C-alpha cells in the first residue's frame, strides 16, 4: 500500500507516518509485520484529527480508513504506538556451510524481543509444541531446518527455512610422480565464454595462474590444469574472481561458473574433499579492456587465502583414479 516513516514523541511514544499510495478497496489498512497495539490513529490532513478505528487483522495492526480517499496521490495516516515498534521478524538460521560430512551445528537467532524460538527439522511448520531453541541444533543427517518466533504460545513471525545436506567427500586420485606447477593451454580469439576455446596456440607449464605467456593483451584465453593438494578431509570453499569470464573445475566437475563477459566479479562454490590430490582446472578469458584473475580457497584450519604454487602440482607419471 505504500511506505512508513517514524518519529519519536514524548512519553516513549513512537509516531508512525503511513504514506498510502494505493488506497485499500476494503477500507482496511493492514500493516504487515507490525505487532504493536495502536494508542491512536488519524489522518495527517484532517484538521480535527478525528480518530480512526484500529484493531487486528491476521494478527497484524489494521486501521479502518474513510470511504473517500482524501488524496489520490499520497494520503498520510498517523498511528501512535507505545514504545518501539514490535515488528515480526523471521528468525535467522545459519551454519558454517549448507553441506557437511559428519555433523553440523546450526544456530537459530532473532532480533525480535520477548520471544521464544521453536524449530523443526523435518520440513514441517513449527508450532507452539515444537522443540525450543536453547542452543545450537546438531544435525547428523540431511534436514530442512524451519524456525519461527512465538510469544505466549502464539506465532509472531514468518517462518524461516534452510536446507542442509550431508555429503560424502570426493576421493583423491593417485599419481606416481608430481612436479610443482600447472599446465596451461593458451588460446586466441573473440570469446564470449570459456567453452568457446578450440585449438590452443601453445602449451606449457607455469607456477600458478600466470598470464605472462600471452602474446596479446586482449582476445585471449588460458586453461590451467593439474592437481590440487588438499590437506585435510572437509568442506572447502573456492572463490573465483575474474574479468572477463572464468570457470573452476574440481575432479572434472564445474564448481564455480563465473563465465561470460563482465567486469571484475567474484563467485564461490563449495565441495567436500578427502585429503590428497584432486583434479583441478581453471579456464579464463579476456575480451577487451582490463583483465583480472584471482583464485582463493578456504577449508578446515585453512583461512581464506590465494591458491599458490605450494598448492598445485602436475603429474609426471601415471594417474590412477579412485572410485568416488
Regions found by a protein language model. Give the residues of each.
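Mature catalytic domains of secreted/periplasmic carbohydrate-active enzymes
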Residues: 1-93
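Short proline/glycine-enriched turn/loop motifs at strand-loop junctions of beta-rich domains
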Residues: 24, 34-38, 110-116, 241-245
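Short tyrosine-centred short linear motifs in exposed loops/low-complexity segments
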Residues: 27, 140-143, 232-238, 274-277
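Short beta-strand elements bearing conserved aromatic residues within extracellular beta-rich modules
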Residues: 41, 117-119, 246-248, 293
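Short, compositionally stereotyped local motifs that mark structural "simplifiers"
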Residues: 83-182, 191, 195, 199-223, ...
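Aromatic-lined ligand-binding clefts that engage carbohydrates, nucleic acids, or primary amines
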Residues: 108-110, 228-230, 234-248, 280
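Short, surface-exposed beta-strand/strand-loop-strand elements in extracellular ectodomains
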Residues: 239-257, 294-297
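Short beta-strand-plus-loop segments that form exposed binding edges in beta-rich domains
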Residues: 281-290
Amino acid at each position: 500500500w505504500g511506505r512508513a516513516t517514524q518519529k519519536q514523541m514524548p512519553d516513549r511514544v513512537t509516531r508512525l507516518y503511513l504514506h498510502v499510495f494505493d488506497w485499500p478497496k476494503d477500507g482496511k489498512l493492514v500493516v504487515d509485520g507490525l505487532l504493536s497495539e495502536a494508542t491512536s490513529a488519524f489522518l495527517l490532513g484532517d484538521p480535527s484529527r478525528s480518530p480512526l478505528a484500529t484493531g487486528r487483522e491476521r494478527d497484524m495492526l489494521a486501521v479502518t480508513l474513510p470511504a473517500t480517499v482524501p488524496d489520490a496521490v499520497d494520503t498520510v495516516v498517523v498511528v501512535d504506538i507505545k514504545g518501539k515498534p514490535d515488528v515480526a521478524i523471521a528468525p535467522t538460521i545459519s551454519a558454517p556451510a549448507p553441506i557437511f560430512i559428519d555433523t553440523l551445528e546450526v544456530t537459530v537467532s532473532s532480533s525480535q524481543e520477548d520471544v521464544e524460538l521453536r524449530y523443526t527439522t523435518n520440513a514441517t511448520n513449527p508450532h507452539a509444541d515444537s522443540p525450543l531453541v536453547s542452543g545450537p541444533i546438531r544435525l547428523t543427517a540431511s534436514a530442512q531446518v524451519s524456525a519461527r518466533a512465538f510469544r505466549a504460545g502464539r506465532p509472531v513471525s514468518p517462518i524461516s527455512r534452510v536446507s542442509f545436506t550431508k555429503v560424502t567427500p570426493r576421493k583423491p586420485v593417485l599419481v606416481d610422480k608430481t612436479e610443482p606447477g600447472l599446465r596451461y593451454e593458451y588460446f586466441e580469439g573473440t570469446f564470449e565464454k570459456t567453452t568457446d576455446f578450440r585449438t590452443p596456440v601453445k602449451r606449457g607449464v607455469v607456477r600458478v595462474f600466470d598470464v605472462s605467456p600471452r602474446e596479446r593483451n586482449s582476445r585471449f584465453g588460458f586453461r590451467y590444469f593439474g592437481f590440487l593438494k588438499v590437506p585435510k578431509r572437509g568442506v572447502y570453499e573456492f572463490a573465483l574472481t575474474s574479468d572477463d569470464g572464468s570457470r573452476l573445475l574440481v575432479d572434472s566437475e564445474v564448481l564455480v561458473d563465473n563465465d561470460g563477459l563482465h567486469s571484475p566479479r567474484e563467485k564461490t562454490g563449495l565441495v567436500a574433499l578427502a585429503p590428497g590430490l584432486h583434479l583441478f582446472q581453471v579456464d579464463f578469458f579476456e575480451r577487451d579492456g582490463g583483465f583480472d584473475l584471482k583464485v582463493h580457497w578456504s577449508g578446515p584450519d585453512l583461512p581464506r587465502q590465494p591458491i599458490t604454487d605450494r598448492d598445485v602440482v602436475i603429474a609426471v607419471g601415471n594417474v590412477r583414479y579412485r572410485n568416488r
